[in-house]
């Protein structure tokens, strides 16, 4: 998957999985446009850091426009930016609703529209959503209906877009994750979180990245929700 001419746009790219994806795509020869609200400039001339709130339609449009202006094209969009809020259903607030809908759905919708317009002009492109296995297998001790609502919407949109654009050289996929060992999970929570997976451990950031890279390479795969979750979605646990 090495081609210096190709360009990937990655949201939520300042830390964790997003930061790892930036490096992985650079290692594969891609130039990268990396976005988050507070991302810092990169010393790598082939990484354009673009700060802004991806839920803002104007930011989404500018992000794709800047990618084309700087690097001449866009080949892959990874919708990695996300908010996860776990609390009892009746405890969710209007602010929780706005944050989850804004980042998880609006943050997918507007930039994906802009990217697909570009892909149509090129006759090729790939979109990947980062989702969660909680959509398929809710966990009694993890009440997170807003994650199921928003990420479930992404799963459905992934399949719908895959069919809509299959004849135009555009693939659309998603990676549904279990719990990944990122900075958002303090070390003292790891043992309890590991027990939620049949494999008995947390996923590593590299394992999430490997799922995305598999889909990037798998040219005959579209409309796929790839579970990288330690067996979580396979059955009751």
Give, region by region, the residue ranges found by the protein language model.
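The beta1-alpha1 cofactor-binding region of Rossmann-like NAD(H)/NADP(H)-dependent oxidoreductases
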Residues: 51-63, 94, 207
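A short, exposed helix-loop element centered on a Lys and neighboring polar residues
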Residues: 112-113, 159
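C-terminal substrate-recognition "lid" of short-chain dehydrogenase/reductases
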Residues: 170, 201-228, 233
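Catalytic loop of short-chain dehydrogenase/reductase
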Residues: 128-153, 158-167
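Conserved glycine-rich cofactor-binding loop
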Residues: 14-15
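Substrate-binding pocket helix/loop in short-chain dehydrogenase/reductase
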Residues: 88-89, 96-101, 193
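Active-site loop of short-chain dehydrogenase/reductase
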Residues: 5-6, 73-74, 119-132, 142, ...
């Amino acid at each position: 998957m090495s081609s210096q001419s190709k360009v990937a746009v990655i949201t939520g790219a300042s830390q964790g999985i997003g930061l790892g994806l930036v490096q992985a795509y650079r290692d594969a020869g891609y130039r990268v446009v990396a976005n988050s609200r507070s991302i810092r400039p990169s010393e790598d001339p082939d990484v354009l850091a673009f700060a802004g709130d991806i839920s803002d339609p104007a930011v989404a449009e500018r992000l794709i426009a800047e990618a084309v202006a700087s690097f001449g094209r866009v080949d892959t969009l990874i919708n990695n930016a996300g908010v996860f809020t776990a609390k009892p259903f009746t405890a969710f607030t209007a602010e929780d609703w706005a944050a989850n809908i804004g980042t998880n759905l609006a943050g997918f919708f507007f930039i994906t529209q802009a990217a697909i317009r570009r892909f149509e002009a090129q006759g090729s492109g790939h979109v990947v959503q980062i989702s969660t296995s909680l959509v398929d297998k809710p966990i009694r001790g993890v009440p997170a209906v807003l994650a199921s609502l928003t990420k479930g919407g992404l799963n459905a949109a992934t399949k719908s877009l895959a069919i809509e654009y299959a004849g135009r050289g555009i693939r659309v996929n998603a990676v549904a994750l279990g719990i990944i060992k990122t900075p958002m999970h303090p070390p003292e929570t790891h043992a309890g979180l590991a027990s939620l997976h049949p494999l008995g451990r947390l996923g590593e950031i590299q394992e999430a990245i490997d799922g995305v890279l598999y889909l990037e390479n798998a040219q005959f795969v579209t409309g796929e929700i790839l579970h990288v979750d330690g067996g979580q979605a396979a059955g009751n646990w």
